[in-house]
């Protein structure tokens, strides 16, 4: 799962450098910036943009620049070709480019368009001009004003259409340190506005499930605990606070992944049956008749070749006598369970 940050010239070089350092530590490889923000007056883009580009280059972060022919002069360049020399690898194009020009630019850069405004006619024109859509990206807007954002359902519909063509998809969630002038967060999806902490990270996971390839923090920064979670997304390993019973502590701190043929009822560990150092127990029937959401189950010897397999209940299940109850996911982390599926990773940690 890929994540990104947003950098604003009005924040100042030092603040941006601090955010880039946090992003690099978390494993982020994308940043978005714009040269067309009305509130950013008095910025020496020729100097500041080059400093920002150098900062991102050293951190191995791809900078996506929102540019137009009119903004080239702000950077002190004459042609788009010169942007590549500055280290810009993605350019967001909104207006002023015909299909032939767009396809030509896509041979030098990844070209990025507003995801909500790409039409069937645009697609046809680019195809006729010889477009390779793996060089194209669709970036959703963020929406500073309340009640102007999209629904998650609408985002998923747009993404499914463009992803099928080969487009890379970008979207935004709000940060926790807001940007003015409204200070209401910068999400793509309206229902994500105002979220923070783990709920914000779960919003990012919802956007990945809606076919987003990279999810950016729209505002300038997030808290330290959220940065930690962002690092987990980049490593494809969600940490789950867990209480394990005696004899099952061996399950702590092991990387596991849900099977690609994901079950709607349980998270099914691919790795657990392969651990050579893991004990396999006889059945120890529980007095419980059901397993609640977040129950951690380990198959006993009575399951034959499935012995040792770990699963996590996604909801209330009838408990099989051949399964031993090893512990539970702590209540505060159970909201992550719907997003752990189809090869996504997890790790049990102590509360």
Where are these regions (language model features)?
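Residues in well-ordered beta-strands of folded domains
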Residues: 6, 139, 313
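C-terminal functional modules
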Residues: 245-351
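Catalytic alpha/beta core domains of metabolic enzymes, predominantly
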Residues: 116-246
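Short secondary-structure transition/capping segments
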Residues: 8-9, 24-27, 76-87, 106-119, ...
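N-terminal small/glycine-rich loop or linker at the start of catalytic domains
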Residues: 1-7, 56, 175-185
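Electropositive, surface-exposed helix/loop patches at the edges of structured domains
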Residues: 65-82, 98-103, 132, 150-157, ...
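Active-site beta->alpha loop and helix N-cap motifs at the rims of alpha/beta catalytic domains
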Residues: 3-135
């Amino acid at each position: 799962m890929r994540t990104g940050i947003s950098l604003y010239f009005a924040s100042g070089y030092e603040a941006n450098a601090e955010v880039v350092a946090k992003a690099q530590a978390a494993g982020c490889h994308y940043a978005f910036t714009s040269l067309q923000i009305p509130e950013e007056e008095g910025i020496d883009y020729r100097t500041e943009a080059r400093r920002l580009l150098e900062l991102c280059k050293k951190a191995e972060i791809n900078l996506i620049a929102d540019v137009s022919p009119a903004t080239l002069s702000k950077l002190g360049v004459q042609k788009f070709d010169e942007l590549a020399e500055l280290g810009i690898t993605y350019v967001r194009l909104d207006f002023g480019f015909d299909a032939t020009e767009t396809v030509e630019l896509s041979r030098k850069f990844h070209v990025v368009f507003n995801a909500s405004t790409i039409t069937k006619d645009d697609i046809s024109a680019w195809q006729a001009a010889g477009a390779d859509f793996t060089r194209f990206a669709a970036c959703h807007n963020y929406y500073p004003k309340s009640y102007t954002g999209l629904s998650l359902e609408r985002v998923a519909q747009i993404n499914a259409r463009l992803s099928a063509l080969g487009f890379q998809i970008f979207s935004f969630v709000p940060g926790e340190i807001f940007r003015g002038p409204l200070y209401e967060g910068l999400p793509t999806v309206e229902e994500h506005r105002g979220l923070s902490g783990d709920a914000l990270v779960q919003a990012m996971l919802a956007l990945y499930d809606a076919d987003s390839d990279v999810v950016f923090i729209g505002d300038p920064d997030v808290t330290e605990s959220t940065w930690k979670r962002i690092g987990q997304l980049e490593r494809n390993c969600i940490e789950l606070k867990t209480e394990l019973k005696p004899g099952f502590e061996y399950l702590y701190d092991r990387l596991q992944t849900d099977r690609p043929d994901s079950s709607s009822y349980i998270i099914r560990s691919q790795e657990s049956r392969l651990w050579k150092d893991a004990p396999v127990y006889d059945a120890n029937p529980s007095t419980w008749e059901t397993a609640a959401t977040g129950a951690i189950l380990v198959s006993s010897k009575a399951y034959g070749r499935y012995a040792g397999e770990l699963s996590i209940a996604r909801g209330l299940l009838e408990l099989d006598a051949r399964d031993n109850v090893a512990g539970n996911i702590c209540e505060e982390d159970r909201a992550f369970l719907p997003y752990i599926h189809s090869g996504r990773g997890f790790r049990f940690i102590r509360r």
